[in-house]
């Protein structure tokens, strides 16, 4: 078995170079699970959490943003829409939110954000196939209360959040870096070849 691989990011992760009072979601907004998850997050989580997190802004980015989400913009919710550069946008923001309630397959955007050292709050569905550990590499929330508590944790204890992001980066580099996966593939092929032809 060879996992999905991502390119190594040669990016200096400097403390304090991003908007510390921000959280964000980025993804294709013509994909039904993204629409459902973000709508749920806005209606059930953010509608309560933003009162407890004054000064924190939620940024929603992604192509084909539906009118139902465009209408949600307010002083603590910035509906950005499509952005040119996922990496640059992510590096400018703090906590990544991935509130997936449905869908299958590995979440490439989560792996890419982890490789940037981002702290991510997602659901059990969002982390499927990745193998990251809750509270160490990522924060997993499957209820409204858990999402709110993890948001409050990240903004009240930025050093803890930063540590989770750094652990996420190390985890992805160890398990999903393309050059390491290719090296493992070569090793496996050599082992097969060394056994000779199948009689």
Segments (PLM) and residue ranges:
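Short glycine/proline-enriched, acidic/aromatic patches that form the donor-sugar handling elements
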Residues: 67-69, 86-87, 104-107, 126-131
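A short, well-ordered alpha-helix in the C-terminal region of glycosyltransferases
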Residues: 153, 160-174, 181-187
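Short acidic/histidine- and often glycine-rich active-site loop of Leloir-type glycosyltransferases
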Residues: 124-140
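Short hydrophobic beta-strand element within catalytic cores of glycosyltransferases
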Residues: 109-112, 119-123
């Amino acid at each position: 078995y060879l996992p999905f691989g991502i390119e190594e990011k040669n990016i200096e992760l400097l403390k304090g170079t991003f908007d510390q009072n921000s959280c964000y979601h980025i993804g294709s907004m013509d994909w039904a699970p993204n629409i459902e998850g973000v709508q749920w997050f806005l209606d059930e989580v953010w509608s309560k959490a933003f009162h407890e997190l004054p000064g924190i802004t939620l940024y929603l980015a992604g192509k084909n943003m539906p009118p139902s989400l465009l209408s949600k913009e307010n002083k603590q919710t910035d509906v950005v829409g499509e952005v040119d550069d996922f990496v640059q946008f992510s590096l400018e923001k703090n906590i990544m939110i991935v509130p997936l309630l449905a869908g299958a397959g590995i979440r490439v955007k989560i792996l890419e954000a982890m490789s940037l050292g981002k702290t991510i709050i997602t659901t059990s569905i969002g982390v499927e196939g990745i193998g990251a550990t809750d509270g160490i590499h990522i924060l997993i929330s499957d209820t409204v209360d858990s999402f709110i508590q993890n948001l409050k944790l990240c903004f009240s204890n930025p050093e803890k959040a930063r540590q989770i992001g750094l652990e996420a980066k190390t985890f992805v580099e160890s398990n999903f870096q393309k050059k390491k996966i290719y090296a493992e593939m070569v090793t496996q092929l050599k082992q097969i070849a060394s056994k000779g032809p199948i009689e």
